[in-house]
């Protein structure tokens, strides 16, 4: 009798906890769906000025009408010459992406962010390609203007990732723009892109931009 009561009680508690967890998740999803439209623009243009967010950048013509467009930026207290080496060595199996490696590697991307300049990856050329994971897209260098712009496009043409360096009086603006097309996405997939992938991309890209900036500033200080 006591054993059955204990078992029933444990089952009841587990059911109650599961119900609470489901209710909490539903509430969190509902809140995001309700509030995200109010801060979506901030999410997609974090750190960028109005001019940077709306102005033209190299690579825009490679995907004229994206479904998703983000432009994010940081100010770096270093010249473009101290930022550029970190950009050209980025990638899986290279210098990583300077973001949360453990999250990247959950998706099998093989990212290991370097804290030093790797000479073997400094000779990037137009046409070079790198695959993001075993089944991920292949990104190929399409535009390379040293210390000014680096633009990659996926071989399927649905993703353009552009980096621009804009000198200022005392530093450099580092701008990252993503143009993404999802032509065959279902309504559910588009909703997931909006409410899950966009905020997630901000978390990862913010870390990346700040990480590049910190490394560049350290390099500039070292002379």
Locate predicted features.
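Short amphipathic, positively biased membrane-proximal segments
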Residues: 1-69, 73, 81-82, 164-173, ...
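Glycine-rich portal/gate segments that line the openings of hydrophobic small-molecule binding cavities
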Residues: 56, 63-64, 75-82, 88-162, ...
């Amino acid at each position: 009798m006591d054993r059955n009561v204990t078992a029933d009680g444990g089952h009841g508690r587990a059911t109650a906890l599961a119900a609470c967890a489901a209710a909490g998740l539903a509430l969190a999803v509902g809140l995001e769906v309700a509030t995200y439209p109010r801060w979506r623009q901030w999410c997609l243009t974090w750190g960028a000025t109005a001019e940077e967010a709306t102005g033209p950048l190299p690579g825009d013509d490679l995907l004229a009408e994206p479904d998703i467009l983000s432009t994010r930026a940081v100010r770096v207290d270093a010249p473009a010459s101290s930022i550029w080496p970190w950009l050209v060595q980025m990638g899986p199996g290279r210098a990583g992406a300077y973001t949360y490696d453990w999250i990247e590697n959950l998706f099998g991307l093989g990212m290991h962010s370097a804290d030093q300049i790797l000479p073997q990856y400094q000779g990037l050329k137009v046409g070079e390609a790198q695959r993001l994971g075993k089944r991920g897209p292949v990104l190929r260098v399409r535009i390379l203007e040293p210390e000014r712009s680096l633009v990659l496009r996926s071989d399927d043409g649905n993703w353009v990732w552009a980096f621009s360096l804009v000198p200022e009086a005392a530093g450099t603006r580092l701008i990252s723009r993503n143009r993404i097309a999802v032509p065959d996405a279902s309504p559910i997939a588009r909703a997931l892109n909006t409410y899950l992938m966009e905020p997630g991309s901000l978390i990862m890209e913010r870390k990346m931009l700040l990480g590049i900036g910190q490394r560049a500033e350290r390099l500039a200080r070292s002379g």
